[in-house]
Amino acid sequence: SRGLGDVYKRQDRVDGAIYKISGVDPGKGMNWKQYALALLGTNAVMAFIGYLILRVQSAGLFNPNNIENMEPTLAFNTIISFMTNTNLQHYSGESGLSYLSQMLVIIFMMFVSAASGYAACVAFIRGLAGRTKNDVGNFFADLVRITTRILLPFSIVGGLLLVWQGVPQNFEGNVVVETLEGTFQVIAMGPIAALEIIKHLGTNGGGFLGAN
């Protein structure tokens, strides 16, 4: 649409700061091979970092529930799943991930995978337009603009609406309460609202809780 197309025509101070820090020239075009390599390389690096975080999460911050490290095959399956936006979960978030892992791995990859998919789609459309086969855009610029202009603004507003409606957004440990029947139930805490909003905006599933 025209509104989404305008996202790629403007640059603000936030974008400029990100480009400057990362050393990206947003005006430098890429051919399709360079674009694809940038997309794959960026996601591969992020997946590697995410895998390491999952493997050492017990030693990190924001782990009030004392979650242990994720074992190698499960960590690999998890990070590849969220990198590819398939979001296959063979764990329960409230008992298998620290809050740091939820934020730096799951939530982060939900943003990156959605933005990467959108960027690839835009580059494909540029290629079909046939202006030049040697310039389908700049992947890094597209990734930044999609994130800062579309995903983050909607996520912030939507996340605040979820918090307003009572969805937890904190770093407290899980709470054990006694029900009216006299049994005990664990109430999960954590940055749930932040994850749930990007889940609905940019992915096809993968919730904070095991019940999803």
Feature names for model-found ranges:
Residues 20, 38-51, 81-86:
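A generic, lipid-embedded transmembrane alpha helix
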